[in-house]
Amino acid sequence: MADQLTEEQIAEFKEAFSLFDKDGDGTITTKELGTVMRSLGQNPTEAELQDMINEVDADGNGTIDFPEFLSLMARKMKDTDTEEELIEAFKVFDRDGNGFISAAELRHVMTNLGEKLTDEEVDEMIREADVDGDGQINYEEFVKMMMAK
């Protein structure tokens, strides 16, 4: 599984892993797993974390070594951003179902997610993703934006 990762990704994961391996013993605790993954741009839910930990932590000792961590990250990266998930996410933002995400729709969803954004910040997000310059985000632009992270 981990053999599908680039050397660069492996180096990045090793660096992140080391940051959280406080005592340098080559393992991280399960609590730290969520923090490590979030630092790498992943966003696992509590349930996903528990599942991953259960899969990886075979002896139930509450720690994960680097090879286990690598296979975990490889698995997680393979699962992210499927076409289906992107379509579902787009529908969440496109509240009126017209095929476009407006500034108002973006602001509404971001507010519901607990992100308090100024009008300027919302406009900036739209501008960054709005390839054709029509002031809103269509599905293609949304996919590009999501895959660029």
Curated annotation (Swiss-Prot):
GO terms for cellular component: myosin II complex. Ca(2+) 2 binds at D57, D59, N61, T63, E68. Ca(2+) 3 binds at D94, D96, N98, E105. Ca(2+) 4 binds at D130, D132, D134, Q136, E141. InterPro entries: CALM/Myosin/TropC-like (IPR050230), EF-hand-dom_pair (IPR011992), EF_Hand_1_Ca_BS (IPR018247), EF_hand_dom (IPR002048). Residues 8-43, 44-79, 81-116, 117-149 form the EF-hand domain. The keyword Chloroplast does not apply. GO terms for molecular function: calcium ion binding. It comes from the Eukaryota. The modification N-acetylalanine is found at A2. Keywords: Acetylation, Calcium, Metal-binding, Methylation, Repeat. The modification N6,N6,N6-trimethyllysine is found at K116. Ca(2+) 1 binds at D21, D23, D25, T27, E32. SMART domains: EFh (SM00054), efhand_Ca_insen (SM01184). The keyword Acetylation applies. Belongs to the calmodulin family. Calmodulin mediates the control of a large number of enzymes, ion channels and other proteins by Ca(2+). Among the enzymes to be stimulated by the calmodulin-Ca(2+) complex are a number of protein kinases and phosphatases. PANTHER family: CALMODULIN LIKE 3, MYOSIN LIGHT CHAIN 1, 3. This protein has four functional calcium-binding sites. This is Calmodulin. It comes from Pfiesteria piscicida (Dinoflagellate).
